[in-house]
Curated annotation (Swiss-Prot):
It catalyses: N-succinyl-(2S,6S)-2,6-diaminopimelate + H2O = (2S,6S)-2,6-diaminopimelate + succinate. SUPFAM superfamilies: Bacterial exopeptidase dimerisation domain, Zn-dependent exopeptidases. Its cofactor is Zn(2+); Co(2+). Binds 2 Zn(2+) or Co(2+) ions per subunit. One of its GO terms (biological process) is diaminopimelate biosynthetic process. PANTHER family: ACETYLORNITHINE DEACETYLASE (PTHR43808), N-ACETYL-L-CITRULLINE DEACETYLASE (PTHR43808:SF31). Zn(2+) 1 binds at H66, D99, E162. It comes from Xanthomonas euvesicatoria pv. vesicatoria (strain 85-10) (Xanthomonas campestris pv. vesicatoria). Zn(2+) 2 binds at D99, E134, H348. This is Succinyl-diaminopimelate desuccinylase. Homodimer. The keyword Amino-acid biosynthesis applies. Pathway: Amino-acid biosynthesis; L-lysine biosynthesis via DAP pathway; LL-2,6-diaminopimelate from (S)-tetrahydrodipicolinate (succinylase route): step 3/3.
Amino acid sequence: MSDVLELTCDLIARASVTPADAGCQAAIAQRLRAAGFGCEHLRLGEVENLWATHGSGAPVLVLLGHTDVVPPGPREAWTSDPFDPQIRDGVLYGRGAADMKGSVAAFVVAAEQFVAAHPTHSGTLAVLLTSDEEGDAIDGVRRVAEVFRERGQTIDWCITGEPSSTERLGDLLRVGRRGSLSGTLTVKGVQGHVAYPHKARNPIHLAAPALAELVARQWDDGFESFPPTSLQLSNIHAGTGANNVIPGELQVAFNLRYTPHWDAPRLEAEITALLDRHALDYTLRWHRSGEPFYTPEGRLRSVAREVLGEFAGAPPEESTGGGTSDARFIAPLGAQCIEVGPVNASIHQVDEHVRVADLQALPALYRTLIERLLVE
């Protein structure tokens, strides 16, 4: 069994459902220390974070990943135990195989190989891991970034091991992500009998024109390689369950995925103004998950495009699609950020898996990226 495959299996066997780490980072730190890395454990709240560095000074290249996984769901739905890694027909199955214990294992192996071959490399190679990526992401990289700001820690380049490939390893290079902003709108009315609407105020009827305007609005036409900003209603609830009662309150949850054309305060102001025009009696709670980030043409992007093209046999698609990642907390530090990882077809699903051949190729891919950035 190859080194990366063995380490991936060891990590999968640790049931690190967010925010638990289940000893993953301790095992990784032991290996990185043996390779000459300095390791710092940053426990913030209930979350484990690991900051490991080799070398000194600029440029600083960070390999960013997470050791937590989403819950497996009903175990009887899996072909095999989600935390008992199994290889069948050249495919490794287990929770976290693709998202993202395979990438984390590949980071470790690539880092070990790189510093063994280039012990006096230029700049700093760092590995940053958290156990709070799949959950609320409050005490993970978000908090670590605050610590870095206080210390004056700079980062030049960041490679996140998120499963970015679509069909074959290296066919997509993630160069940015949209921002994410969620809102919970509560519209107040007056409860009453449906036969006497004049004695009540139906919050569904009152809010309907405003909601229609919200969902019909075209926020922008996209930005660079970003798709247009999108607002989606995700949950609507009102009423007691009885069909003869006008509800006294309506609650609507919604989410915006937005381009760098916007920021969260401007979007919040726009939506508040729209609701005010409709003279609603309402409250609105916001949750800012992260601002958008975008890595323009530069050394990191050009090197990654070149390396992925070599490994995949064709230039990668360069995309800003998908959800959010922890790179959104590193980019504001001034870092150029990209995401490179295995095929994402099975992430968060029953029988999550990664092709063994892809997993075994990942360390060489990451090591090549590191060498072209830190070896002059």
